[in-house]
Amino acid sequence: MIKISNRQIVDVLRFSDDKAVLVEKKPNPDSTSYGVNYFILNFSTGEKEIVTKDAYLLKKYGTKRKEISEKLGNFVMPGAMILEDRSVLVIYPNGETGMFNAEGELVRDGLLSYNDSPVCCIAEDGNCFWSVCEGENAVIRYFAEGAKMDIRIGGKNQLTFDRPHFVSADDKYVYVCCNHNSVRKIDKATFTVTDVNRRYNDITGYYKFGKFAIVTTFDGAYCDKD
C-alpha cells in the first residue's frame, strides 16, 4: 500500500473512472474547529491533483450545491445521494437525515434508526442505498424514496458482521468495514457475504475503484491495488 495522506480523511467521492476526490481534515491552530483540504487522486498516474471546493460540492450535492451546503453547515460529514428527480438525501454519522428537493429546499428531516440504534452511511445501489447499524450488527438496504427498509443482513446475535461502522459500494459489491480491523463484501446479485482478502489495522473506511482501493485509517489514507 502507498500512503497518500497523513491527515484524517473525512470524505471520499468518485470523481471519474480513474479519479477520486478526498477531503482531509486540517487542524486550525487558532481554535478547536478544523478546516479541510480537497484533492484528487489520479489512479492512472498516481499523482495528486488540485480540485476546488465547488467541484467537490457539485459532485456530492448536484446543481443546488450552494443552497444545500449552506443549510447543512457541516457538508463534508454526511453521506449524500442524488436521486433521479435531482432531490438529495443526506445521512449524518449519528443517523440524522434530510431530504432536499430539486430546488435545494429541505422538505423532510428525521433520525434513521433500527431497533432504536442509529443507522449511518450511504452506499448507492440503483434506487436504493445501503447503511450500517453498528449497535445491531446489521447492514440494511433501504429504498431511497422514503428511506423504507428493503433488506437486512446480519443482526445483534449473528456473527455475519462485527460492529459494522462504514459501508461503500461499487457496481458489483457492497463493502462493509467491521470493528476497525476487517472488510467484508456483499455480492449485490446473490447477497452472499465474504471477506476481502486483505486485513487492515485501524480502518475507518474502504472505497473500491476498479483495481484500486482507498483505505482510510485513524492516521491517514492509503491506496491499495489488487
Regions found by a protein language model. Name each.
Residues M1, K48-G73, V107-N115, M149-T160:
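Surface-exposed loop and turn segments in beta-propeller and other repeat-based domains
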Residues K3-V36, F75-A80:
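Beta-strand-rich domains and repeat architectures in extracellular enzymes and scaffolds
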Residues R7-R14, K59-T63, G73-M81, D116-E124, ...:
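Repeated scaffold domains used in trafficking and secretory/extracellular systems
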Residues D17-K19, D85-R86, G126-N127, D171-K172, ...:
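Short coil/turn segments that connect the beta-strands within blades of beta-propeller domains
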Residues L22-S33, V90-N94, S131-N137, V176-H180, ...:
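Conserved beta-strand positions in repeat-built beta-propeller and related beta-rich domains
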Residues K25-D54:
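Beta-propeller domains
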Residues D30-I40, E96-M99, N137-R141, S182-R184, ...:
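Structural motif
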Residues N42-G46, N101-E105, F143-G146, D187-F191, ...:
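Short loop/turn segments that connect beta-strands within beta-propeller blades
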